[in-house]
A protein has these predicted regions:
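Active-site HxH/HxHxD metal-binding segment of metal-dependent hydrolases
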Residues: 4-68, 162
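Residue-level signal for the nucleotide or nucleotide-sugar donor/cofactor binding architecture
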Residues: 15, 72, 111-112
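Metallo-beta-lactamase
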Residues: 76, 81-172
Length: 175
């Protein structure tokens, strides 16, 4: 059995799915129900992915997922894209395009929602703050310079300290 989890279906993350499905016909492809192509305009930005299995959890809600000895937690983290999820377990937090090393994903593409992104960032900060600081955050892109490099990953301790969005994110009504 081969399994592929999708954080979201923007073309830069999902372009290879048809070829993967052809090459590995038994591939299980997991994604959030809301990540299905949202509109005609969205077809330019999103790639249709025929998920074999979906989650339908509410924004910010975590779902435990297991396959063999692999146990992960999927959190519905919309904002950058509908149905965006983050995945964590086994010492890794895969942020997709919710978070990068020092910044966060954009919300100006079709399906982007700044308010949902803000809520997802607040929830991500809560989750990251409860995980070991030596775990690794893997961003969906390597955009940010950190300590003279553009790293593939950053420790959760460093991302909590140096990510501008996490350092300053609040929801209206919070102190």
């Amino acid at each position: 059995m081969c399994i592929r989890d999708s954080t979201h279906t923007h073309r830069d993350h999902a372009a290879g799915y048809p070829g993967m499905m052809k090459r590995f016909p038994d591939l299980e492809v997991w994604g959030h129900e809301e990540a299905r192509v949202p509109s005609l305009l969205g077809n330019v930005v999103f790639r249709k992915v025929d998920f074999t299995h979906t989650w339908d959890n509410e924004p910010g809600e975590c779902v435990d997922w297991s396959a063999g000895s692999v146990n992960l937690v999927m959190t519905h983290s919309p904002g950058h894209a509908p149905g965006h999820v983050t995945i964590h377990g086994h010492g890794v937090y895969h942020a997709g395009d919710l978070l990068f090393v020092r910044s966060a994903g954009r919300v100006d593409l079709p399906g982007g929602d700044p308010r949902a992104q803000q809520r997802s960032l607040v929830r991500a900060k809560e989750i990251l703050s409860g995980l070991p600081v030596d775990w690794r955050l893997i961003p969906g892109h390597r955009y940010d310079n950190f300590r003279g490099e553009v790293p593939d990953w950053i420790s959760l301790g460093d991302v909590l300290q140096h990510n501008y969005f996490l350092a300053h994110i609040t929801m209206p009504g919070e102190d």
